[in-house]
């Protein structure tokens, strides 16, 4: 018997871990899908325990527990939110265990949005450490928006 023939099937059948960029994109896509499907456990399972979510309102800086408390009623109703990435850029720190990204989002309720954030590879799983949701404002509208924000009374 030729030992090479017995080794070859083992090499072919061995699972190959996904490329880091594909793995990070898969986590982000599943995170957004979990919100659209109102799967609260799956959604918050993608966040690290110390994660921070920055919302579009200047007052919205939530740690994971506060964000979950805010979001729970939406998930409990069976509808959270729907974000679909239409463009995404992902980069990695030296060592490959920290990634950052920005993504353009299509959202039915808010219109075009942008998300950016940081993930860390922990025990083979990418976890979201920070997510910043923003609404891009065309530069031509900035003066009007700035005035309206100044006039806004919370």
Locations of regions flagged by a protein language model:
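Generic alpha-helical structural signal
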Residues: 25-29, 65-69, 127
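A short acidic, helix-capping loop that chelates divalent metal ions and anchors anionic groups
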Residues: 53-55, 139
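Surface-exposed, charged secondary-structure patches
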Residues: 16, 52, 66-112
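Short, low-complexity N-terminal intrinsically disordered segments enriched in polar/charged residues
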Residues: 4-49, 140-154
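Short beta-strand edge/turn micro-motifs at domain boundaries
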Residues: 112-143
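A mature extracytoplasmic/lumenal domain signature
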Residues: 47-48, 57, 87, 94, ...
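Hydrophobic pocket/interface hotspot
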Residues: 31, 43-44, 51, 67, ...
């Amino acid at each position: 018997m030729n030992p090479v023939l017995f080794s070859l099937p083992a090499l072919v059948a061995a699972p190959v871990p996904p490329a880091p960029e594909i793995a990070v994109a898969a986590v982000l896509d599943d995170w957004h899908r979990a919100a659209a499907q109102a799967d609260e456990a799956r959604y918050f399972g993608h966040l690290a325990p110390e994660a921070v979510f920055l919302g579009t309102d200047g007052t919205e800086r939530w740690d994971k527990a506060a964000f979950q408390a805010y979001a729970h009623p939406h998930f409990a109703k069976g509808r959270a939110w729907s974000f679909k990435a239409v463009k995404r850029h992902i980069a990695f720190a030296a060592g490959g265990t920290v990634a950052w990204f920005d993504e353009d989002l299509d959202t039915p309720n808010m219109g075009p949005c942008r998300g950016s954030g940081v993930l860390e590879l922990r025990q083979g799983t990418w976890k979201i450490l920070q997510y910043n949701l923003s609404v891009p404002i065309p530069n031509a509208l900035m003066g009007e928006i700035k005035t309206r924000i100044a006039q806004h009374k919370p």
